[in-house]
Amino acid sequence: ALSKVFIDDLMQALSDLNRPEIRCIILRAPSGSKVFSAGHDIHELPSGGRDPLSYDDPLRQITRMIQKFPKPIISMVEGSVWGGAFEMIMSSDLIIAASTSTFSMTPVNLGVPYNLVGIHNLTRDAGFHIVKELIFTASPITAQRALAVGILNHVVEVEELEDFTLQMAHHISEKAPLAIAVIKEELRVLGEAHTMNSDEFERIQGMRRAVYDSEDYQEGMNAFLEKRKPNFVGH
């Protein structure tokens, strides 16, 4: 379950992996897992009178960190995904799942009033009608259905899952890391607001400026002209 201790450890691991030589991260459960994650640790939800999903809730913290993390994060899913864990993987950049995986949003089983940020994290990719069905029924959907409605990027057989995901991560890792980081941030900002305010625009422009002033940008141009594979170094 997504206990505070588990999420603290996960956030620390992500912080430790935020190094220039790391280009892509895979979020996964142990191989052979029947349950990818059971979602919130129910024992840690507060009693009546307190918001169970406040701004500082561990789930809110990890979803923000995943969304704002400067490197692509791939969720490699084997087993069933429940509740808050579904939102957590929806916050990642790509989701690759085994064909036997299932996905459930279960707050209404517990009477939990899911918050606006969490709903937004789901509707940004899945669409309102799909999210309504998932939440209103709390029924699991198959990986095949999740792929068909745009929740997943790929569905593969379980025995091929790790190799397929590693190949995807390796492919991403060969690209320009600074450009990927700024585009990920652009997509996050655009996904969170209907309009972009002037401060955000200037900040993004500054990030883009740092990319096209970088050695990697020049290396990419040179490699294209010279018809060779670029060697990106991250500065």
Placement of each model-derived feature along the sequence:
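A short acidic, glycine-rich active-site loop
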Residues: 46-60, 206
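A structural preference for short, pocket-lining loop segments at secondary-structure junctions
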Residues: 5-50, 65-75, 94, 98-102, ...
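Well-ordered beta-strand positions
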Residues: 93-94, 133, 137-139, 145, ...
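Helix-loop "lid/cap" segments that line or gate small-molecule binding pockets
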Residues: 134-135, 186, 190-192, 206-212
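CoA-thioester-processing core
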Residues: 62, 66, 76, 82-135, ...
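C-terminal long alpha-helix characteristic of the crotonase
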Residues: 96-101, 152-202, 231-235
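Glycine-rich phosphate-binding loop at the start of an alpha helix
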Residues: 39, 56, 60, 83, ...
